[in-house]
Structures are given as structure tokens and as C-alpha cells.
Regions:
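Amphipathic protein-protein interaction modules
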Residues: 71-141
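Polar/charged low-complexity regulatory segments
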Residues: 13, 20-28, 34-35, 52, ...
């Protein structure tokens, strides 16, 4: 498989409104059936939302600097950040670069995010809602998403500096 080294431009997949990557409410019925705590509807996507927040990939209209700082300090979990956005991740919330990357990587059908998440959390796609949040898994996911993003051709800003792709 050839690694894509140049980032692709963002093209909205359809013209009738924003593209919804995921909504926590899509998983409420399953979480209820499995008798899991309600917060489990957030966990698998919260890892990605946390990465977006920590890497400054939210658009200005959605950036929440204080909350994101608390996340970086590990005083709130990415679940709290995702809940702050109503448990919804939509393309309009992201920078253009993050939208393009998310269309490629975070797509549940074609992308690598769920495969990566399942591999690192040692769960199957049928069991991801059972995976509990841990800071260790979150840290490992951050590093892996960083690597996927660099391979895709993106640059990561940390404290005002861009890291080479």
C-alpha cells in the first residue's frame, strides 16, 4: 500500500448541509441495551475529539481555549470536550485541514480510525462501546493519530510552532 504524502483538499461529500462524522446519540440505544453507563456513547469518538482539541484543529467558531487548556492539563477528559459540543462532530466545526484529514481517517467505513482504536483498546468493532476511557489509551491514541496525520501530509502545531510533516 502506497502512503499518501500530500494532503488532499477538503471537498464536502454532499451539498445539502454539513457532514456529520459522529453523534453520541447514534449509540444511545446500544448503550442502553448493553446496560452500560451513558458516558460510553462518547468514549470512542472522544479520543479523536480530544486529539482535534489538543492539536488546534477546531475552527475559530468552535475553539474553546479554556476547555482545551484544561484537557491539555488533564483536568478534564476528552469525553467532557465532546459533551461540550453536544456529543456531535460535524465538518463545520473543524479547520479545512482537519476536515480533509477527518474525511480520510475518521470515516467509519473506509478510514483507519476505528481499526486503530480497536487494535489499541483490544476490542472489536462490535464491542467498542464497552471500552472504558483511560488516560493511557488516550495518550497512545494521540501518538498514533499524530503519526497518521503526518503520513497524510498534515502539520501539527504545539505551542505556536509547527512540527514538520
Amino acid at each position: 500500500m502506497r502512503v499518501q504524502s500530500i494532503s488532499r483538499p477538503y471537498i464536502r461529500p454532499h451539498s445539502n448541509g454539513p457532514h456529520v462524522f459522529d453523534r453520541a446519540r447514534y449509540h444511545e440505544g446500544t448503550v442502553r441495551e448493553l446496560r452500560l453507563p451513558r458516558r460510553q456513547v462518547y468514549v470512542h469518538t472522544a479520543h479523536y475529539v480530544g486529539w482535534l482539541a489538543e492539536r488546534n484543529k477546531f475552527s475559530r467558531n468552535y475553539a474553546s481555549p479554556f476547555l482545551f487548556k484544561l484537557l491539555r492539563m488533564r483536568l478534564v477528559t476528552p469525553i467532557k470536550v465532546y459533551a461540550h459540543f453536544g456529543g456531535c462532530l460535524v465538518d463545520d466545526m473543524l479547520t479545512m485541514e482537519a476536515r480533509a484529514f477527518s474525511m480520510s481517517y475518521f470515516d467509519f467505513e473506509q478510514g483507519h480510525y476505528l481499526k486503530d482504536y480497536c487494535a489499541l483498546s483490544r476490542s472489536s468493532p462490535d464491542n467498542i462501546l464497552r471500552t472504558r476511557f483511560t488516560w493511557q489509551l488516550y495518550g497512545t491514541m494521540l501518538r498514533l493519530i499524530d503519526e497518521r496525520f503526518r503520513r497524510w501530509g498534515g502539520s501539527i502545531r504545539t505551542r505556536g510552532r509547527a512540527l514538520a510533516a
